UniProtKB/Swiss-Prot annotation:
It comes from Tolumonas auensis (strain DSM 9187 / NBRC 110442 / TA 4). GO terms for biological process: lipoprotein biosynthetic process. Pfam families: LGT (PF01790). This is Phosphatidylglycerol--prolipoprotein diacylglyceryl transferase. The gene is lgt. A 1,2-diacyl-sn-glycero-3-phospho-(1'-sn-glycerol) binds at residue 137. It is found in: Cell inner membrane.
């Protein structure tokens, strides 16, 4: 059993506080950026557009994830304290909203740069996105947020800032799942699967949101109105992503068979 009471602030520089959550988010994003540069170079693509593309994605991720969290999980609080919506370094990003924000960002980028194809980009961006998701969940762990149900298992974590109960470290479950998905996607990208348009993106959607659906059963409700529900809001929101991923993989396989 682990007793956990980490300080959410990584370092204090005078009046400026660098939070673990923000630092881990930035680390994941920067590593993803480096990976995309390598992918572009390996495929003989110019890297000049990457800065613009990833700026769009960063904005889409943060805005989409933050708005989804505030509107779905804590609408009463943020309607009463709207300025707190801007405090993203304190945590509170919903992955479903972030996913939608990323898709909109890619769509907007492709509209402005039609020489790029949506699914070609999505297949490749899926790889660093899984890695970034891993780092974001580690940030949640450092913040002692998105906690799990109580457990009698020896792997339980007591989040001392919350209570004295040993709980499932669901943040670490998700982080490990996303890292495993990242490794799998990276391995498949080095095979002929990278030539099947839409396959890697479809696999990403299916695995990430299937993992999210399963792990939700070990989480405490993130909103009061979820208490007692057999299916959580996060699970309902995951279903369309899983179905979309399966459809993309089937279409990719059908195209390959032609």
């Amino acid at each position: 059993m682990l007793f956990w009471n980490a300080d959410p602030i990584l370092i204090q520089l005078g009046p400026i506080a660098v939070h673990w959550y923000g630092a881990l988010f930035a680390t994941g994003f920067l590593l993803g950026y480096q990976l995309m540069q390598r992918i572009y170079r390996q495929e003989g693509r110019p890297t000049e557009q990457l800065d613009k593309l990833l700026t769009y994605i960063f904005i889409g991720t943060v805005v989409g994830a933050r708005l989804a969290h505030t509107l779905i999980y804590e609408p009463e609080y943020y309607l009463a304290h709207p300025i707190d919506i801007l405090k993203i370094w304190e945590g509170g990003l919903a992955s479903h909203g972030g996913g939608i924000g990323v898709l909109l960002a890619i769509w907007l980028f492709v509209r402005q740069h039609p020489e790029n194809k949506f699914l070609w980009l999505a297949d490749r961006l899926a790889i660093p996105t899984a890695l970034t998701g891993c780092f974001i969940r580690l940030g949640n762990f450092m913040n002692s947020e998105i906690i799990g149900n109580s457990t009698d298992g020896s792997w339980g974590v007591v989040f001392e800032r919350i209570d004295t109960l040993p709980r499932h470290p669901v943040q670490l479950y998700e982080a490990a799942s996303y890292f495993a998905i990242f490794v799998l996607l990276l391995m498949l990208f080095r095979t002929t699967k990278s030539k099947q348009t839409g396959f890697l993106f479809g696999l990403f959607l299916t695995l990430v949101f299937a993992a999210r659906f399963i792990i939700e059963y070990f989480k405490t409700p993130q909103a009061a109105y979820e208490a007692g529900n057999l299916i959580s809001v996060g699970q309902w929101l995951s279903v369309p992503f899983v179905l979309a991923g399966i459809v993309l993989m089937l279409l990719s396989a059908k195209e390959k068979a032609r």
